[in-house]
Amino acid sequence: MMTDLSLTRDEDEEEAKPLAEEEGAREVADREHMFDKVVTPSDVGKLNRLVIPKQHAERFFPLDSSSNEKGLLLNFEDLTGKSWRFRYSYWNSSQSYVMTKGWSRFVKDKKLDAGDIVSFQRCVGDSGRDSRLFIDWRRRPKVPDHPHFAAGAMFPRFYSFPSTNYSLYNHQQQRHHHSGGGYNYHQIPREFGYGYFVRSVDQRNNPAAAVADPLVIESVPVMMHGRANQELVGTAGKRLRLFGVDMECGESGMTNSTEEESSSSGGSLPRGGGGGASSSSFFQLRLGSSSEDDHFTKKGKSSLSFDLDQ
């Protein structure tokens, strides 16, 4: 007799399991998805409230005049079967529908962050009046890496420096120290500064340059405006032979005493570019013969003078 009772209980339990599974499957199938809400920083912040979009609030959680002041208590279940109770009300100050009490506890338990998605569902009862509310959540979707933003694709052009053949300084000095390589920095005047030059690398001619070549920035000498041209003209100098004497004068010209003596003798001396730095100009005399050397030695003068009576 005892054996028959035990067998009967086992058969009843086995029949009850499929029935419970069918009811659970039917319950899941009868769930109606209401809406999703992407939580904002304020929804998971210190305000401790969740703003429900107006169109969804008025459709699924309507409030009458009696419950508008105090609000409603809504009971939800998550996927694990845990119950959550939220106070749902309307705020006249912000004219928004919000869930306040109990929401902060849900945020802490699920560790919600801004961008996460909260989903609301319901299961309508057989009578059509009573319904069970469900709440679920999921992390914000990860943005896939777009091929357009791959490394090197955002910067289609890289820059490198031009060769010395295209520099501003090369056309002035190429006949003196053109080596086909770098610059001869020892022969660069002080008036030359340093600048930066870049040129675009055409990807059509060299597709690998856009990815492989790094961006290189170095300084190259460039000629400053105005002063360098005057200095080059001044240092080149001008030569004049006057009364058997070879004279070389710089840019700034001669002194006043020399100009007076040369003008009284009927001669004129050419002037340089005018207005250059007087400290860098120079005046040199070179005698043309040994007799002229003796002539100046006998006079015992260290400065230049001209005797028109000779």
UniProtKB/Swiss-Prot annotation:
PROSITE patterns: B3
Region (Disordered) residue spans: 1-26, 251-310
SMART domains to which the protein is assigned, alphabetical: B3 (SM01019)
UniProt-listed GO biological process terms: flower development; leaf development; regulation of leaf morphogenesis
Transmembrane segments: none
Subcellular location: Nucleus
InterPro entries: B3_DNA-bd (IPR003340), DNA-bd_pseudobarrel_sf (IPR015300), LEC2-like (IPR044800)
Stretches with biased composition (Basic and acidic residues): 16-26
Entry's Gene Ontology cellular component terms: nucleus
A Pfam family that the UniProt record links to this protein: B3
SUPFAM superfamilies: DNA-binding pseudobarrel domain
UniProt keyword Transcription regulation, yes or no: yes
UniProt biased composition (Low complexity): 251-268
Keywords for this protein: DNA-binding, Nucleus, Transcription, Transcription regulation
DNA-binding region residue numbers: 35-141
One GO MF term: sequence-specific DNA binding
Summary of the function given for this chain in its UniProt record: Regulates lateral organ growth. Functionally redundant with NGA2, NGA3 and NGA4.
Complex formation: Interacts with BRX. Interacts with BZIP30.
Name of the protein this chain belongs to: B3 domain-containing transcription factor NGA1
Source organism of the structure: Arabidopsis thaliana (Mouse-ear cress)
Gene: NGA1
